[in-house]
């Protein structure tokens, strides 16, 4: 086939697809017409095609800013696989030798390279800025744009320097893309990238094929996980743990129980990490047990379950990680284990960080706890968090809708909670408020004399989990 004449022909010619998904065509047209373009699209919606196709069709080199070396490598390999020459796409980062960098620059100068993937750190290097000023650029793509926002779940300070650097290189259209952005994060991204007038394309964040469930974390969690895996014989799944040690221990436990599982975390040597990732992609193992270092840019469409061993640090992170299930449209089970103890542990980890970071971290954690303890439809809660309305009363595909929790009258406990907070002059955390209400004679409560308050022990007989839920709400 000769060079494609229109977008549909180009889509078929380069990617083999017969039609665009969702907003893809309108997004590409917006960018090719020279408009700044902001894309909010859930995981699996086809974000990368929104900048890859125009990059192949437009004159010059597109600068694609991406946070992870592994992510860049995967995307460059994928583009080279559909192109006649490897020179069409390159990445520029700290893993390259001087000779390799010189070759990349030569290919760009010779007009062969349509896509250059760079980490923000590489983009800000003086010699790279100088070089990029001398080449024709088609547009800039900022992938994983939520990294710009302090309110995002994966804030990276170097992302804040992108706009000033773009201004130094050359003014061209910018496309910013993310799979997770609350209205607050969206505003922050647009402000920081100077994209207030950008054309906004927002796809629905609803993933109807995903089943959401939150379980109380108990002493038999490892056995429960084995049962979940055995319910999906020969199928792929991801288990997320917060600590590297837990990743190693759980992977070993699953192996001992004759399950095909491998660990993945940033502390492993890169060769083992890559080998384990490839084994998962090539279906030589069924389960990958990982920290959140795993998954960004991993395109495995048939993941059937995602388990969170620990409650995630934010709902954005939860949405992105669960979003790795069922990308082929088939079923995806998302099961999260939750305990108030985990929450306290995570709050402790935050101590020692800058105050503003602690405050944001605690707020994000609070939102996650509210989600876990809520009796409302999980889908409704999640979509509301991302600024989207869900009008159905029952989604039929979450634990709260399939087995509605018994409604309990909480008016008296709520009044007692407000009275306790008032008696403590609004100066103490939820855990302390609960201890006062339960009548616990801790050293702090005695030191402050709060065991003499009228409200001390006012909810001594109330179930602790119920009290937690009321205080959080």
Per-segment meaning from a language model:
Residues 24-27, 368, 413-420:
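Short alpha-helical "packing" element that flanks the helix-turn-helix/winged-helix DNA-binding module
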Residues 364-389, 397:
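C-terminal accessory regions
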Residues 170, 375, 426:
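Flexible coil/turn residues that form the inter-helical turn or adjacent wing/linker of helix-turn-helix
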Residues 22-23, 379-386, 430-436, 449:
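Short coil/turn segments at secondary-structure boundaries
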Residues 5-14, 18, 22, 26-38, ...:
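Helicase motor core with emphasis on the C-terminal RecA-like subdomain
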Residues 1-7, 93, 361, 391-473:
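Accessory DNA-binding and partner-docking regions appended to nucleic-acid-acting proteins
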């Amino acid at each position: 086939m000769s060079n494609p004449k229109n977008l549909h022909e180009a889509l078929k010619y380069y990617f083999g697809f017969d039609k665009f998904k969702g907003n893809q065509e309108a997004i590409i047209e917006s960018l090719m017409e020279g408009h700044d373009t902001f894309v909010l699209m859930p995981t699996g919606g086809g974000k990368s095609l929104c900048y890859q196709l125009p990059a192949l069709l437009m004159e010059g080199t597109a600068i694609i800013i991406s946070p992870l070396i592994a992510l860049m490598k995967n995307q460059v390999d994928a583009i080279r696989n559909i192109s006649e020459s490897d020179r069409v796409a390159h990445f520029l980062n700290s893993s390259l030798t001087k000779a390799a960098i010189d070759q990349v620059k030569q290919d760009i100068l010779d007009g062969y390279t349509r896509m250059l993937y760079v980490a923000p750190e590489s983009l800000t290097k003086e010699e790279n800025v100088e070089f990029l000023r001398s080449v024709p650029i088609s547009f800039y793509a900022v992938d994983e744009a939520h990294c710009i926002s302090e309110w995002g779940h994966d804030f990276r300070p170097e992302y804040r320097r992108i706009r000033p650097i773009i201004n130094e290189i050359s003014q061209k259209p910018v496309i910013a893309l993310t799979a997770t952005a609350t209205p607050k994060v969206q505003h922050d991204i647009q402000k920081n990238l100077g994209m207030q007038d950008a054309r906004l394309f927002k796809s629905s964040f609803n993933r109807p094929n995903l089943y959401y469930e939150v379980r109380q974390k108990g002493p038999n969690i490892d056995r429960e996980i084995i049962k979940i895996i055995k319910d999906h014989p020969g199928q792929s799944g991801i288990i997320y743990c917060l600590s590297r040690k837990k990743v190693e221990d759980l992977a070993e436990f699953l192996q001992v129980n004759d399950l095909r599982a491998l660990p993945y975390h940033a502390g492993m040597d890169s060769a083992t990490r890559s080998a384990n990732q490839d084994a998962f992609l090539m279906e030589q193992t069924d389960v990958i047990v990982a920290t959140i270092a795993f998954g960004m840019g991993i395109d495995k469409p048939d993941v059937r379950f995602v388990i969170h061993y620990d409650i995630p640090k934010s709902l954005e992170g939860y949405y992105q990680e669960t979003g790795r299930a069922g990308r082929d449209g088939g079923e995806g089970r998302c099961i999260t284990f939750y305990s108030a103890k985990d929450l306290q542990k995570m709050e402790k980890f935050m101590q020692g960080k800058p105050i503003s970071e602690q405050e944001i971290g605690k707020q994000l954690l609070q939102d996650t706890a509210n989600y876990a303890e809520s009796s409302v439809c999980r889908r409704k809660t999640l979509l509301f968090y991302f600024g989207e309305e869900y009008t159905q009363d029952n989604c039929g595909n979450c634990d709260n809708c399939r087995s509605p929790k018994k409604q309990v009258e909480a008016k008296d406990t709520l009044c007692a909670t407000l009275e306790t907070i008032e008696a403590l002059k609004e100066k103490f955390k939820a855990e302390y408020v609960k201890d006062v209400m339960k009548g616990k004679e801790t050293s702090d409560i005695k030191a402050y004399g709060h065991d003499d308050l009228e409200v001390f022990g006012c909810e001594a007989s109330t179930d602790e989990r119920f009290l937690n839920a009321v205080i959080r709400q």
